[in-house]
Amino acid sequence: MMNKHIFYYLMVGSMALLLGACNDSMNDLLEPKVYFESKEYNFSVEDEMDVMTFDLVSRLSSATSSQVDVSYSVAEPSVVDEYNAKYGTNYEMLDVSQVKLSSTTSSISSGKLYADNIEVELSGLEALKAGNSYVLPMRVHSSSVSTLSGTNIAYFFFSKPLKITKAGNFSNHYISVKFPVGTFFSSFTYEALINVDYFLDNNTIMGTEGVMILRIGDAGGGITPKDYLEVAGGQNYRVTKPLLTNRWYHVALTYDQPTGKTGIYVNGEKWAGSDWGIDGFDPNSDMGFYIGRIYGFKWGERPFHGKMSEVRVWSVARTENQLKQNMLGVDPASEGLALYYKLDGSETQEGGVIKDATGRIN
């Protein structure tokens, strides 16, 4: 009988401990916390803009009966290193000397949710390089309440518009690519900077005709408007809005074979996507791989009239962040980079053959 009583008391004691732990967790969840409502903010730095200002504000998860004091500081550089490692990006942190706060402290009045705004002023922005991406991480603190983990740091991203001063003219030119024998892309990425002078019914960017090609339009076939990006060949889909002439775009097509996910990206933003169930493709098959025109194709060569730069093919599916971060250049020795033409005048040519920057294409 005593053993039963001991077991009973042990069981009751354990239940009390569990209930106490649950109550602590519930109380922690209900406790007001301070945080940033959004974790990421994006700004474009226009030409000749040297100074920029924006408001910084934090908030409470629930109102309190007394005033809550908050303070702000620029987060340490290791925060940016961790972000880059997690998301495969290479943001550069703005120098602390470029940052000026109207005040490092603010307050949230009793019964309110939002702190009074403070102004952040950034200077020296003219020195930012076009095409590079920068970040300012700001941290919120409070001695009155706890901060909400994961949202106590806000990332403010800054970039300058693309400036392309040298590029390859494809109006009457093309590149024929012979990948090493046996090349087979399971996952892959096509990407390029393009600027269209004018649209024909069908405009070749790059790929293997009838197999896997990224192009603009198929108006002659009555399928895709002449200014819409599309994938054609064994698989087909397109975007839902047009490109414009005389404007630079970064365009990309990705396919991740393990997941079957594919996407068409413009300036790092996903414009269309689909699900495929293919093993991959041989870029040397059928007519072979072409950039700018399908030379000798009996149904029409489908030339691209305009300029291209930073033409790349990868044997991996690049992420959205990687596309955004590397529009103006990558290391030719990057893992998975199968083809790279910068087309900025830096390539060497021999006998009408342009040399690939990776050194992998003969």
Q: What residue spans do the PLM features occupy?
A:
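Bacterial Sec-dependent N-terminal signal peptides
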Residues: 2-7, 12-50, 151-162
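Short glycine/proline/serine/threonine-rich loop/turn segments at secondary-structure transition edges
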Residues: 126-135
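Extracellular glycan-interaction surfaces
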Residues: 160-169, 195-199, 215-278
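Extracellular glycan-recognition modules
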Residues: 162-227, 318-322
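Extracellular/lumenal carbohydrate-interaction signature centered on repeated Trp-anchored short motifs
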Residues: 178-190, 240-249, 280-282, 301-307, ...
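Short hydrophobic/aromatic patches on beta-strands that form ligand-binding or substrate-lining surfaces
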Residues: 188-198, 251-253, 291, 311-313, ...
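Extracellular glycan-interaction patches encoded by glycine-rich segments
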Residues: 285-309, 321-329
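Extended recognition patches within non-cytosolic domains
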Residues: 310-362
